[in-house]
Amino acid sequence: MFRRLHIQMTFFSALIIGIVIFIMTTACNFIAENSTRQNAWNTFQNNAISCISHLETQSIISSDWILQAEKNYDISMDIRDNGNSLYLKKLQTDSLDETIFRKAEEISAASYALDLSNPGAVSKLTKRIFFQMKDFYVSTALIPKSHGTVSMIILY
């Protein structure tokens, strides 16, 4: 009788310990996942701000800089000068990227009142917003220049 009780208590203890370990592991994974997601969001915002700040200070946009920034920050950029897409991007962008860029532009205009297709909407200060789409982090910006406006969409 004691042997049977001993076996039952052993299995019961193992079950309780297993449940406690499972709950603790799940909680730790949840916390780690949220931290990783928040870290990725903060990194994206910092990288996007760096790119926007660089474009604010430059009068000439180098294709080498664009390619290097996209590679270093693991982002895709759509930069338009007074509504005209840069020639470099016309050669590289595939239809999927173009669809995502246009969707980001629509969300920016509809939900955040930052219309990239209306370059006259910005005065003397750069306007930028950050938001999330289903699979992407997005930043859109309108940057005033002496010759007009540079609009920018960054996807991560």
Identify the residue ranges that each predicted region occupies:
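Juxtamembrane segments flanking the first transmembrane helix
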Residues: 1-95
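Compositionally biased, low-structure terminal segments
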Residues: 3, 45, 102, 131-132, ...
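Residue-level marker of intrinsically disordered, low-complexity segments enriched
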Residues: 14, 18-19, 29, 77, ...
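Generic detection of intrinsically disordered/low-complexity segments and helix-coil linkers/edges
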Residues: 35-38, 124-125, 130-131, 150
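Extracytoplasmic ligand-binding sensor domains of the Cache superfamily
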Residues: 64-132
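Short, hydrophobic beta-strand elements of compact beta-sandwich sensory domains
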Residues: 132-156
